[in-house]
């Protein structure tokens, strides 16, 4: 298949509309059939629940061109399940898992020319989302919803190499105790914007959000989970009920245990113990793993000695193994790769 004539290595991580997207409506207690459309505009009532009370959830995943020329997605079933969990928490009708997977397949096939070629470092980013489309003036769930899924090509996240990030401990909370921090709701990200802009203005790449109950444990950043590596090579990930369950983190844990033979522990991680770790990384769909060189806690620098100038050795092995699985150069566990074309 002939690909679009783009400079794939320099397209950046921005929105670029593609040919087709998928739309399905929920009305009268049931989801409609859904269909592909070329129209990228969303037309809704001025009193729609999404506009009045932010009733919305979303997902993020990618399509890849593998070494043999196939077009695949990575563990989309987990995105479908997580979106169903998010919808249920927000009193929205879950979009069925099989329908979700069919929508992903349809959008990728319809935009196959936009899937970057193997070796370019670029991918086709997929954004499924669902929102309250029916009018609501009182504070209550809407009666009508819309599920949509669009695609946009994105360039390599680490153009020219992975430069370690510097983070700061935020004075703000990302989520409330017993709140919605464990689901992928747009309102969580809106809450983090002020803290994010403030951190960037101060010269930091991202925030470190602490647990909202005691503010002594590390949770996550505005859009990624943490991975820490001990001086003995053990992988440690924070455990908390208010952390979004990252599919990338879950996959990296499997890679660490079953591909690299590393010990993995999921437990609460105290801010006070960060100086004991040799490496630190942020994991998520966009970059897989972003290395962190230091975290600044109100003027006090906490440095990670094995990742000050570049991605640390254990973090790099995790990154290379997982991206190899995604790109078809490393054997994948059964069920992880869904071939579309």
Features from the language model and the residues they span:
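Helix-start/capping segments and mature chain N-termini
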Residues: 1-107, 136-341
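Charged, gly/pro-rich active-site loop segments
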Residues: 107-121
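Intrinsically disordered, low-complexity linker/loop segments enriched in Gly/Pro
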Residues: 110, 132-133
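Extended, Lys/Arg-enriched charged tracts that mediate electrostatic binding to polyanionic substrates
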Residues: 117-131
């Amino acid at each position: 298949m002939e690909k679009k004539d783009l400079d794939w290595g320099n397209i950046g991580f921005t929105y670029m509309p593609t040919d087709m997207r998928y739309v399905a409506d929920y009305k009268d207690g049931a989801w409609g059939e859904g269909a592909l459309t070329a129209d990228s505009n969303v037309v809704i009532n001025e009193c729609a629940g999404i506009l009045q009370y932010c009733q919305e959830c979303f997902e993020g995943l990618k399509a890849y061109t593998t070494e043999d020329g196939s077009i695949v997605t990575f563990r989309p079933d987990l995105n479908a399940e997580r979106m169903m969990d998010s919808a249920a928490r927000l009193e929205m009708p879950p979009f069925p898992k099989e329908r979700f997977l069919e929508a992903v397949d349809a959008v990728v096939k319809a935009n196959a020319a936009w899937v970057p070629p193997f070796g370019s470092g670029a991918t086709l980013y997929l954004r499924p989302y669902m929102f309250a489309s029916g009018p609501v003036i009182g504070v209550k769930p809407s009666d009508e919803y819309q599920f949509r899924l669009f695609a946009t090509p994105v360039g390599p996240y680490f153009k020219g190499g992975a430069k370690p990030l510097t983070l700061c401990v935020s004075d703000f909370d990302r989520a409330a105790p017993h709140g919605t921090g464990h689901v992928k709701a747009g309102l969580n990200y809106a809450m983090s914007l002020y803290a994010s802009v403030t951190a960037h203005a101060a010269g930091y790449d991202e925030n470190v959000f602490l647990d909202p109950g005691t503010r002594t444990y590390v949770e996550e950043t505005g859009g990624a989970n943490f991975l820490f590596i001990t001086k003995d090579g053990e992988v440690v990930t924070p455990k908390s009920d208010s952390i979004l369950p990252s599919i990338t983190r879950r996959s990296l844990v499997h890679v660490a245990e079953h591909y690299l033979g590393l010990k993995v522990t999921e437990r609460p991680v105290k801010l006070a113990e960060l100086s004991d770790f040799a490496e630190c990384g942020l994991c998520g769909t966009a970059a897989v793993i972003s290395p962190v060189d230091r975290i600044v806690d109100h003027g006090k620098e906490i440095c990670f000695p094995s990742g000050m100038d570049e991605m640390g050795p254990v973090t790099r092995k995790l990154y290379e193994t997982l991206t190899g699985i995604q790109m078809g150069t490393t054997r994948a566990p059964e069920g992880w790769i869904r071939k579309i074309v």
